[in-house]
Amino acid sequence: MDSEKMDLFSKLPDEVISHILSSLPTKEAASTSVLAKKWRYLFAFVPSLDFNDSDFLHPQEGKREKDGILRSFMDFVDRVLALQGASPIKKFSLNVKTGVDPDRVDRWICNVLQRGVSHLALFMDFEEEYSLPYEISVSKTLVELKTGYGVDLYLWDDDMFLPMLKTLVLESVEFGRGQFQTLLPACPVLEELMLLNMEWKDRNVILSSSSLKNLKITSEDGCLGTLSFDTPNLVFLDYYDYVAEDYPIVNLKNLVEVGINLVLTADRINRARDNVWNLIHGIQNAEIFHISPVTFEVLSLSCEAMPVFKNLTTLNIRTVMQQGWQAMPLLLKNCPNLETLYLGGLLHTVTNKCGDVCDCIPRKKKGRSLMACPVNKIQIQGFRGTIREVHMIKHFLDFCPSLKEMEIIVETKEPTLFEIPKWLEIVEDTLMQYNEMSSCTINYRVLAPLYWRWTRK
């Protein structure tokens, strides 16, 4: 950088320079600060630090084993923290792997905690579990904590208390037995909780919080007995796990959007039939509902228990070819205010219980359920161009009286019939005819590279 440009940067207001330095990775910000004394001075007060050992290491060159590079990284962190002294800090991010000294990591974390850090992101992928320092669990300044990989909370005692914490993200974090039940009461203003790759240590879990608004759970642990949701102000729920033995409490009266992705094995089918309805009834006030293929199958096990989703305006259903649509007729019937329907695939297994939603089996009263459905927009995803799909599209156009818009998105990852020369043109002509015959507007979307490949055949 020439001296003229350097002078221009140096004339910027201090707060602008500080913002620029904060937005850079700390290693780059430190390198930049040697350009001028003013920048070097301001770097000492940068309120955001981001350390990643990959900035120093080059695994593709086989250098991770070189202790000198790891020492260089650790010394760099030490120097930066020493340079900043006791100046306030807002954000601290640390992402390290095996070879970094855990004791030094402890000191770095305690350093920023003492300086009033509010946003903390810690991801340690060590060979052995790393225990987060006790000091984190009693921080009076933390607003956001994100941590994961080889991390546990064994050092956190029953006196944990995080009075300012609003966002907590835990990914593959290990709890001690009974420890999770003390976590939420220790976070009185928590609004967002993400439990990713969760391993439940307790058989019976109660998620209880009056402040929580957003909750995401992903787990394939399969060891949970009962799971309760006592979260009356929850607005968003994304739940992915094996079906629990029971859902005794489901207090979700203010829920707006929910995604249910259940994992089901053969030995849990009866459990799902008997116990999952407490969960489904608990989410009946939602306005947006995302349903995975397995969840859709679970709904078909006991359709008569399905509640009325009186507030539901958007329904997103993903299905697979190996499943039937047994739950579809009653599900649509029980959504009296449905406006938008997303279908992740039209192809499914033909059964005598598909009802009259599809045209799989000829029926005298074909389309009756659709005629009572108020939906005005349908989006079809994963369209493969089969004749059966085209017939299904015509069926929806014929029997959905309120339908104003249909969007068809062509499959991009799996094989389709469009590989057959001229087939895309034939399907497009057919859909164009449907568009002219119907009051519904049909929009057809295909990626440009695929379109050119198929039309050139």
From Swiss-Prot:
User: Per the database record, which ranges form the F-box domain?
Assistant: 6-54
Q: Which domain of life is it from?
A: Eukaryota
What name appears for this protein in its UniProt entry? Putative F-box protein At3g58860
What InterPro entries does this protein's entry cite? F-box-like_dom_sf, F-box_AtFBL13-like, F-box_dom, FBD, FBL60-like, LRR_dom_sf, LRR_FXL15/At3g58940/PEG3-like
